[in-house]
Curated annotation (Swiss-Prot):
MF terms (GO), sorted A to Z: zinc ion binding
Pfam families: Hanta_Gc_C, Hanta_Gc_N, Hanta_Gn-B, Hanta_Gn-H, ITAM_Cys-rich
Name of this protein: Envelopment polyprotein
Positions annotated as glycosylated: N134, N235, N347, N399, N928
Keywords: Disulfide bond, Fusion of virus membrane with host endosomal membrane, Fusion of virus membrane with host membrane, Glycoprotein, Host endoplasmic reticulum, Host Golgi apparatus, Host membrane, Host mitochondrion, Host-virus interaction, Inhibition of host innate immune response by virus, Inhibition of host RLR pathway by virus, Inhibition of host TRAFs by virus, Membrane, Metal-binding, Phosphoprotein, Repeat, Signal, Transmembrane, Transmembrane helix, Viral attachment to host cell, Viral envelope protein, Viral immunoevasion, Viral penetration into host cytoplasm, Virion, Virus endocytosis by host, Virus entry into host cell, Zinc, Zinc-finger
Length: 1135
């Protein structure tokens, strides 16, 4: 019945597969070619095809790299198949027979001696296939081995195998030379005693593919090593097959020859091949649950002309999961076996009538080290409505994410760096990119500035130099840019715009005055009518007509109604109307003269004399007067200059620099100085003041407190590597014999569980060809395959949050690392961390899906013992223990139907813990890391996101001996060396200062970057005696700013100009470098400071480009000429 089920399924699947017969083979390539004959390998498992078509299978390649010619030769196989005997109606050990025939297969993975080495030297590929067959259909697996140079020569190509087309895709990893495992670049090391190299020494599970190479010689007697290693009873090893396995580790390595006693990798592979000879199964997606029907044990003649049986096999029907190609062991010549529908004997405890696999795939544990992670460089340029960005890293990019950007999976490489191009569609918010675990911020405001400058320069392309000089002023973001535009427009066109705008304003005001006058007249008339009506109602009665019921406004109108309405006439137009109320009311709505009596009253009411007042004053205002225009022009220039100066600095985000004037704030010590605040984990804090004697202000002492960003240190227990795997449920049924009679392929899997239902007790659980009740066995097997390491887990034992605190109090310089509930205490200063708000706790498990620099997840519940399949931590490989398999708590059920093969059912979970976590990953807390340091027992990092907070308390005592501590002998000299970056931009500039210290060994202080009026940034630094180089970053300024290095009120003599913001690439800045709070109490910029700033700008804008002043003056003269034409001076005649 299993065969018929397989036929039905294949008949349904085959037409669908023929519609889409193109499949992908991925070959992972490192982005450098290392020394040695390294090759890369890829493979793909293809859908089933008829067994009869396998004889015509030949791989055909369209790749630019030639295929090795040796694979085009025909290999003779002994095909062993089984069939039922015609005279047998009951299943038994003698109810079937095996048949051996000779077949020719072309392109199978029969590698010759030195073939891989020759293909590397001649730049040729090796393309071959393996077959996994039952009695009816075969599933091919296509393999391709190419020299590593192909990664630089090709991106993709096409291979044909029978009805299938396989597209080979060369995919670059970010690894320099290593293998990508768990998102990290692992470099296997041949030495067992290897120590740390460039990274951390570890043991990783690496995928391996091996091919048997038949060659005669005393050094190739493989079964001699089998006998030594596995205590085999193989006595006649001289007459066994001779040769070796050649293996590729991790999809990218130099050839490994198995067995080689002095190569640890080789012996690991050798152990895997002979302890688990079936290796990884060849199940396709959807074949995790399948049924075998074991027909029975069989013997066959290999070759077909042999006089006696030489190979033991087990016949089966059902979905094939393992390779059907093997090598007979009982001959020194390689006898190739093709056994569709039969498992050859691969157990070599007894070497009689056995075989070895032609190919083997599996996993081995290898020691090695992980490649170091290099920082990223990210920059962007404006492109259309968004930004085009690139990221570089010397050692490759393992992770780059940003939800607002489109990051392509196809990466390009430039020399030894990896280049990743991506597009961000929005530039209205800053671009935050996580690259190699670093948080990079690209300030898009600078990109918009560049686009603005480009646009203005393009519009005035006749004078590009002048246009660019003006554009860099106008395109400063915020109010400052608008203030600059207003200032330039007022200077150039104020003489025309001032009278024009004044005229428009006067017109609007006169219109409003006229409206108010008319409105007042109407309101006055309404008031008179209301008073008349009230008086009439008090003396005479109602003002409503008795006939038409219309309410009249005057007595004369009421009297007209009394005469006309009884005569059926309209009192207004004397038109005939029906003598009904409704008719009169309807007529009044269309009558054109109902206001006749109101107008007569308006004429009789004496109008109030209108005094021109405001309206006349507006008419007489001399807005064309040159004196008025000049006065307003000067006033607007002064006002706009002050507003411009006040807005010449950017509004910063918190916590960063706040622009202030020169100097340091002072605090009179009447009482103790206490500061109490919270500080994010990613922020530095600098507090600087002059403490003055309240009794004598001339006496002071310098105080400088520096608190560095938080360091998170955890003592951990390395739990090992977490694996993902596929759980398979297989049913193996045979009609006779005990369950222990056969060995199934899952018996050699690392993790497996079996439940046997031995000796069927009912006819309802037996197929029709079974002998009867009380015989046979149904074996239910659960096993894990396709194991893949996905992450590393660490359990937190203890956790510590610490900061480094340094205090300069006069001459005294002290530093200490303090943690939570700890204090820095000196004679005058006390700095304490009172508490920390954190999301980590003791006992949590940290899981890293890639390099530790990329951050990870926090698990509150992680399985460490009696793990069930599906739990976090279900499949683990600790370094100090063997492979830990999960428990399968579900129960089996044997499903029976009359005259059909029993089927095993499992009611437990079939989804791995990793897949469950990935499906609900948003429900777990994550964290990012920076400045990572780690060993097996301890991990330290800094939080780039500022997700944690420390409660800080600073106390400075008022009891200070100013007489003895006031004098500070330290002398500081300043010199400005160089400047990088741009003024007025979001990214800012970096000033390089040469600072000399004399008279004392060390001194903690701050160096500022300032122009004549304002300081834009500061750097807290510990100076040592002699010359020190200090880099100070700042943001803001203007085109006239001459940036100098300053210390307090003292600045370097020579300053430097920064570049203008333009279309250059905007580099991403590290958030850890940019996150700092600086407080030195310097005063804010006042009126005097604003004027100094305006003067510096005005002198600076013209100092380098006098043509700009000439052009502006030309525009001014043009506006004066235009004013004289449009508003000529009125000539007054002398009386």
């Amino acid at each position: 019945m299993g065969i018929w089920k397989w036929l039905v399924m294949a008949s349904l699947v085959w037409p669908v597969l023929t519609l889409r017969n193109v499949y992908d083979m991925k070959i992972e390539c490192p982005h450098t070619v290392s020394f040695g004959e390294n090759s890369v390998i890829g493979y793909v498992e293809l859908p089933p095809m008829p067994l009869a078509d396998t004889a015509q299978l030949v791989p055909e390649s369209s790749c630019s790299m030639d295929n090795h010619q040796s694979l085009n030769t025909i290999t003779k196989y002994t095909q062993v198949s089984w069939r039922g005997k015609a005279d047998q109606s009951q299943s038994s050990q003698t109810s079937f027979e095996t048949v051996s025939t000779e077949v020719d297969l072309k392109g199978t993975c029969v590698l010759k001696h030195k073939m891989v080495e020759e293909s590397y030297r001649s730049r040729k590929s090796i393309t071959c296939y393996d077959l996994s067959c039952n009695s009816t259909y075969c599933k091919p697996t296509l393999y391709m081995i190419v020299p590593i140079h192909a990664c630089n020569m090709m991106k993709s190509c096409l291979i044909a195998l029978g009805p299938y087309r396989v597209q080979v895709v060369y995919e670059r990893t970010y690894c320099m030379t290593g293998v990508l495992i768990e998102g990290k670049c692992f470099v296997p090391d041949q030495s067992v005693v290897s120590i740390i190299k460039h990274g951390i020494f570890d043991i990783a599970s690496v995928h391996i593919v091996c091919f048997f190479v038949a060659v005669k010689g005393n050094t190739y007697k493989i079964f001699e090593q089998v006998k030594k290693s596995f205590e085999s009873t193989c006595n006649d090893t001289e007459n066994k097959v001779q040769g070796y396995y050649i293996c590729i580790v991790g999809g990218n390595s130099a050839p490994i020859y198995v067995p080689t006693l002095d190569d640890f990798r080789s012996m690991e592979a050798f152990t895997g091949i002979f302890r688990s000879p079936h290796g990884e199964d060849h199940d396709l997606a959807g074949e995790e649950t399948a049924t075998y029907s074991i027909v029975g044990p069989a013997n066959a003649k290999v070759p077909h002309s042999a006089s006696s049986d030489t190979l033991s096999l087990i016949a089966f029907s059902g979905i094939p999961s393992d390779s059907s190609l093997s090598i007979l062991t009982s001959s020194t010549e390689a006898k190739h076996v093709f056994s569709p529908g039969l498992f050859p004997k691969l157990n070599h405890t007894n070497c009689d009538k056995g075989a070895i696999p032609l190919m083997w795939t599996g996993m081995i544990d290898l020691p090695g080290y992980y490649e170091a992670i290099h920082p990223c460089t990210v920059f962007c340029v404006l492109s259309g409505p968004g930004a085009s960005c690139e990221a570089f890293s010397e050692g490759g990019i393992f992770n780059i994410t940003y939800p607002m950007c489109l990051v392509s999976k196809q990466n390009r490489f430039r020399l030894t760096e990896q280049q990743v191009n991506f597009v961000c569609q929005r530039v209205d918010v800053d671009i935050v990119v996580y690259c190699n675990g670093q948080r990079k911020v690209i300030l898009t405001k600078t990109l918009v500035i560049g686009q603005c400058i480009y646009t203005i320069t393009s519009l005035f392309s006749l004078l590009p130099g002048v246009a660019h000089s003006i554009a860099v002023e106008l395109c400063v973001p915020g109010f400052h840019g608008w203030a600059t535009a207003a200032l330039l427009v007022t200077f150039c066109f104020g003489w025309v715009l001032i009278p024009a705008i004044t005229f428009i304003i006067l017109t609007i005001l006169k219109f409003i005055a006229n409206i108010f006058h008319t409105s007042n007249q109407e309101n006055r008339l309404k008031s008179v009518l209301r008073k008349i009506k009230e008086e009439f109602e008090k003396t005479k009665g109602s003002m409503v007509c008795d006939v038409c019921k219309y309410e009249c406004e005057t007595y004369k109108e009421l009297k007209a109604h009394g005469v006309s309405c009884p005569q059926s006439q309209c009192p207004y137009c004397f038109t005939h109307c029906e003598p009904t109320e409704a008719a009169f009311q309807a007529h009044y709505k269309v009558c054109q003269v109902t206001h006749r009596f109101r107008d007569d009253l308006k004429k009789t009411v004496t109008p109030q004399n209108f005094t021109p007042g405001c309206y006349r004053t507006l008419n007489l205002f001399r807005y064309k007067s040159r004196c008025y225009i000049f006065t307003m022009w000067i006033f607007l220039l002064v006002l706009e200059s002050i507003l411009w100066a006040a807005s010449a600095s950017e509004t910063p985000l918190t916590p960063v620099w706040n622009d202030n004037a020169h100097g340091v704030g002072s605090v009179p010590m009447h009482t103790d100085l206490e500061l109490d605040f919270s500080l994010t984990s990613s922020s530095k804090y600098t507090y600087r003041r002059k403490l003055t004697n309240p009794l004598e202000e001339a006496q002071s002492i310098d105080l400088h407190i520096e608190i560095e960003e938080q360091t998170i240190g955890v003592d951990v227990h390395a739990l090992g590597h977490w694996f993902d795997g596929r759980l398979n449920l297989k049913t193996s049924f045979h009609c006779y014999g005990a369950c222990t009679k056969y060995e199934y392929p899952w018996h050699t899997a690392k993790c497996h569980y079996e439940r046997d239902y031995q000796y069927e007790t009912s006819w309802g659980c037996n197929p029709s060809d079974c002998p009867g009740v009380g015989t046979g066995c149904t074996a239910c097997g659960l096993y894990l395959d396709r194991l893949k390491p996905v992450g590393s887990a660490y359990k937190i034992i203890t956790i510590r949050y610490s900061r480094r605190v340094c205090v300069q109090f006069g001459e005294e310089n002290l530093c200490k690392i303090i943690d939570m509930n700890d204090c820095f205490v000196s004679r005058h200063v006390k700095v304490c961390i009172i508490g920390t708000v954190s999301k980590f706790s003791q006992g949590d498990t940290l899981l890293f899906f890639g390099p530790l620099e990329g951050g990870g997840l926090i698990f509150k519940h992680w399985c460490t013992s009696t793990c069930q399949f599906g739990d976090p931590g279900d499949i683990m490989s600790p370094r100090d223990k063997g492979f830990l398999c999960p428990e399968f708590p579900g129960s089996f059920r044997k499903k029976c139907n009359f005259a059909t093969t029993p089927i095993c059912e499992y009611d437990g979970n079939m989804v791995s813990g990793y897949k469950k976590v990935m499906a609900t990953i948003d429900s777990f807390q994550s964290f990012n890391t920076s400045t990572m340091h780690f060993t097996d027992e301890r991990i330290e990092w800094k939080d780039p996101d500022g997700m944690l907070r420390d409660h800080i308390n600073i106390l400075v005592t008022k009891d200070i001996d100013f007489d003895n501590l006031g004098e500070n002998p330290c002398k500081i000299g300043l010199q400005t060396s160089s400047i990088e970056g741009a003024w007025g931009s979001g990214v800012g500039f970096t000033l390089t200062c040469l600072v000399s210290l004399t008279e004392c060994p060390t001194f903690l202080t701050s160096i500022k970057a300032c122009d004549k009026a304002i300081c834009y940034g500061a750097e807290s630094v510990t100076l040592t005696r002699g010359q020190n180089t200090v880099k100070v970053s700042g943001k803001g300024g203007h085109s006239g700013s001459t940036f100098k290095c300053c210390h307090g009120e003292d600045c370097s003599q020579i300053g430097l100009h920064a570049a203008a913001p333009h279309l250059d690439k905007v580099n991403g800045i590290s958030e850890m470098e940019n996150s700092k709070e600086y407080d030195d109490g310097a005063p804010q910029c006042g009126i005097k400071c604003w004027f100094v700033k305006s003067g510096e700008w005005i002198s600076g804008i013209f100092s380098g480009n006098w043509i700009v002043l000439i052009v502006l003056c030309v525009f001014l003269l043009f506006s004066l000429v235009l004013l004289s034409i449009l508003c000529p001076v009125r000539k007054h005649k002398k009386s």
